[in-house]
């Protein structure tokens, strides 16, 4: 129950974003119908989301609406978006008529919580609280006020912050050029305009700033609020325009009098250097405009509403002390106009801070709350995210794929590695086999060229090249066995698909393979052995040469020997510790069985993989080895610091073990493992970027590392390719409200 588009107000936009994000994440497994609130009957022509409309001035309609909903067995609960002024009656007490008549569970979202209530207000709000199963607020301050001033039980309360739209990082200069602001320092304010925006306070702060810095422009973005327009027309906007003229800053202040489409609005925010929030209402709890600006990477200057107090610190913006002080605004604006690096740093930090509030993450929070309120288990299913090559293409130059990104922006200074280009080659061969997309071939050619170029004369490989495409000292300081093994894996994998690939690509890979394979006898480390075994297995599928089978047996026995040396009754593993990409060891052992038919390899593969999984799957979710500290035999496993490579290799190996054994437990765990990316993790946050198809670099104890490097993105892409093979199991079922998820048939 909320105001809803085409009605133009902040709450309507908020509710539409909630509905759309839940639909995006959960599809039709969590259907939502909207009851639109309107002041007059037949006031708007609504879309298909709206099944009911409530004219808020008619108290009888509240009861009649409740009676209609009560007859619907398929409606599990009602979520009410509450704002003062939205419902009629004293402090909106007409809503109580609905709450007293409804027999469905209720979650009420308080967008504003007024402190120090009088007796009447307190009585009405307490009644809403008592008649609701759960209360949602958007800030910690609102939570404190409900507990202290309204006696709300803390157990009934849930904080779910305002959502934000995900955008790609480092688009500011590009968009400034596009909008002809390339030589400007852009200040902005947006939203439906009313005197509560207090824009005149900003205008009075600008003359001295513009005199010193004529490149400063101020964009006032948005139409006048429809309710204000009805009452007083454009009186407030006219006053602002006249004030700008009086102050002689009209050539630097631009009023964009439009209700902008979302993409255009976000573009304006991304190109803004500083966002100014000047609200004069101390009781305003939260602001969607403030949240959007921070998530778009703007440095923020704000009056001290609760949202700003909780979100801003010296690293993300400037929190003003007062609500109506032009001199304070002037000082803060000047400080950031004259310190570009500081405002860029604030923008970066704000962008990172708001990741957990992206609408996809907010959808997860609301969905889990709804499941709790309705006590429904086994009904929520994740939608399967589409494959996207965007970030892989962005990371790839004409030379190879770059190693790291700063957020979503490729970091050229990080250079290139054989490891990542080998991973990328495997991904593109897999992708081309299922899609026949010519872009995959173009990319595969780049990656194979890199592998060819970084091969030494003797057939071995270096791993590291800098941004100038020169070998680095790191190649002399670290053991390159794993990288060489990964290169052989990628070459063998490509050659196993040779029937579907251009002959020149196959011949090039064969030449590189022939030079490299002569060194496999000297491989000693378990992971290097495992990667090499994978390459040999794939090569053996199309070249049944006895020497390849002999090499597989030789290396498999080496790996088996590592197992016998390090294992005991309580530790069924190949080393006396677990580090990264652990799954590749039992995977290689199972490949050895497939190539040779020797059951001893299969037995140890099953034993060790099940041992590994026993430490990965607990309490309905996946928790892999932490990069904060390896899991040492006889010691406790570290937590957090989880990386996509470990999750993806778990998926890859579960896929193989399910194919070979047909054991349903592997498929179920496969589904559970992939749901880690989709929000089934200890933070209930997505670990992928829906905009560009990238994966984030890690899951920490309190936050997601939102850098999007090649390793993480390629691992996620390969995991998606594997999950695409399970076409009948594309959606995931939520088994309980503690996040146990699996595929829905």
For each feature predicted by the language model, list its residue ranges:
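Acidic anion/phosphate-binding donor-loop and adjacent secondary structure
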Residues: 119-120, 147-148, 163-178
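Carbohydrate-associated surface elements
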Residues: 141, 163, 224
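Conserved donor-binding/catalytic core segment of Leloir-type glycosyltransferases
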Residues: 181-197, 203-206, 219-221
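Glycan-recognition and catalytic cores of secretory/periplasmic carbohydrate-active enzymes
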Residues: 217, 245, 360, 368, ...
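Nucleotide-activated donor-binding/catalytic signature segment of Leloir-type glycosyltransferases, i.e.
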Residues: 232-259
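Short hydrophobic beta-strand element within catalytic cores of glycosyltransferases
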Residues: 299-302
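A short, well-ordered alpha-helix in the C-terminal region of glycosyltransferases
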Residues: 335, 342-356
């Amino acid at each position: 129950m909320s105001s809803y588009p085409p009605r133009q107000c902040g709450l309507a936009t908020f509710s539409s974003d909630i509905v759309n994000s839940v639909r995006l994440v959960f599809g039709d497994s969590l259907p939502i119908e909207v009851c639109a609130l309107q002041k007059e009957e037949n006031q708007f022509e609504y879309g298909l989301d709206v099944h009911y409309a409530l004219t808020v001035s008619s108290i009888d309609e509240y009861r009649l609406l409740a009676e209609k909903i009560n007859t619907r067995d398929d409606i599990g609960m009602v979520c009410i978006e509450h704002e003062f002024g939205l419902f009629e009656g004293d402090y909106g007490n007409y809503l109580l008529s609905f709450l007293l008549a409804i027999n469905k569970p209720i979650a009420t979202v308080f967008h504003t919580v007024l402190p120090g209530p009088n007796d009447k207000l307190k009585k009405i709000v307490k009644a809403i609280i008592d008649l609701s199963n759960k209360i949602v607020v958007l800030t910690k301050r609102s939570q404190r006020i409900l507990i202290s001033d309204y006696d709300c039980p803390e157990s009934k309360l849930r904080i779910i912050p305002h959502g934000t739209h995900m955008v790609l990082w480092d688009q500011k200069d590009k968009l400034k050029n596009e909008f002809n602001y390339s030589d400007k320092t852009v200040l902005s304010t947006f939203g439906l305009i009313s005197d509560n925006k207090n824009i005149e306070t900003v205008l009075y702060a600008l003359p001295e700033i513009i005199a010193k810095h004529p490149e400063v422009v101020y964009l006032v973005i948005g139409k006048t609020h429809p309710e204000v327009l009805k009452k007083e027309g454009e009186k407030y906007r006219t006053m602002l325009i006249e004030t700008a003229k009086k102050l002689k800053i009209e050539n630097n202040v631009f009023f964009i009098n439009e209700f902008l489409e979302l993409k255009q609005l976000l573009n304006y925010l991304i190109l803004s250097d500083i966002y100014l929030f000047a609200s004069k209402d101390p009781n305003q709890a939260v602001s969607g405009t403030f949240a959007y600006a921070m998530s778009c990477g703007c440095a923020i200057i704000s009056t001290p509403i609760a949202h700003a107090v909780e979100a801003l610190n010296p690293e993300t913006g400037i929190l003003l002390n007062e609500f109506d002080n032009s001199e304070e605004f002037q000082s803060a604006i000047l400080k950031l106009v004259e310190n570009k690096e500081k405002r860029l740093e604030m923008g970066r930090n704000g962008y990172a801070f708001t990741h957990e509030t992206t609408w996809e993450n907010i959808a997860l929070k609301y969905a889990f709350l709804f499941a709790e309120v309705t006590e429904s288990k086994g009904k929520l299913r994740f939608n399967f995210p589409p494959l996207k090559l965007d970030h892989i293409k962005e990371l790839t130059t004409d030379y190879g794929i770059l190693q790291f990104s700063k957020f979503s922006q490729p970091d050229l200074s990080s250079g290139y590695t054989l490891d990542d280009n080998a991973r990328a080659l495997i991904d593109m061969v897999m992708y081309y086999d299922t899609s026949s997309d010519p872009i995959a071939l173009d990319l595969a050619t780049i990656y194979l060229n890199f592998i060819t170029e970084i091969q030494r004369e003797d057939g071995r490989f270096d791993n590291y090249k800098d941004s100038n495409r020169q070998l680095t000292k790191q190649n002399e300081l670290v053991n390159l066995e794993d990288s060489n093994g990964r290169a052989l894996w990628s070459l063998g994998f490509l050659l196993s698909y040779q029937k579907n690939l251009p002959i020149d690509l196959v011949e090039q890979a064969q030449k590189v393979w022939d030079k490299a394979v002569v060194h496999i006898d000297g491989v000693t480390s378990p992971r290097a052995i495992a990667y090499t075994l994978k390459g040999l297995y794939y090569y053996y599928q199309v070249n049944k040469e006895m020497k390849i089978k002999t090499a597989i047996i030789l290396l498999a026995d080496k790996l088996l020997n590592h197992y016998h040396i390090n294992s005991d009754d309580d530790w069924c593993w190949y080393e006396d510790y677990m580090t990264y990409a652990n799954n590749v060891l039992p995977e290689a052992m199972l490949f050895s069985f497939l190539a040779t038919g020797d059951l001893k390899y299969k037995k140890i593969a099953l034993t060790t993989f099940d041992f590994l999984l026993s430490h990965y799957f607990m309490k309905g979710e996946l928790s892999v080895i932490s990069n904060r500290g390896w899991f040492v035999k006889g010691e406790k496993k570290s937590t957090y610091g989880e990386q996509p490579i470990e999750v993806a290799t778990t998926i890859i190996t579960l896929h193989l073990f399910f194919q070979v054994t047909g054991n349903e437990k592997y498929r179920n765990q496969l589904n559970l493992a992939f749901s880690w990316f989709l929000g089934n993790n200890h933070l209930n946050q997505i670990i992928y970027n829906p905009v560009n198809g990238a994966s984030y670099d890690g899951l920490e104890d309190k936050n997601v590392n939102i850098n999007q490097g090649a390793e993480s993105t390629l691992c996620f892409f390969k995991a998606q390719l594997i999950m695409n093979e399970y076409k009948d199991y594309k959606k995931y079922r939520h088994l309980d409200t503690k996040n146990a998820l699996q595929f829905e048939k």
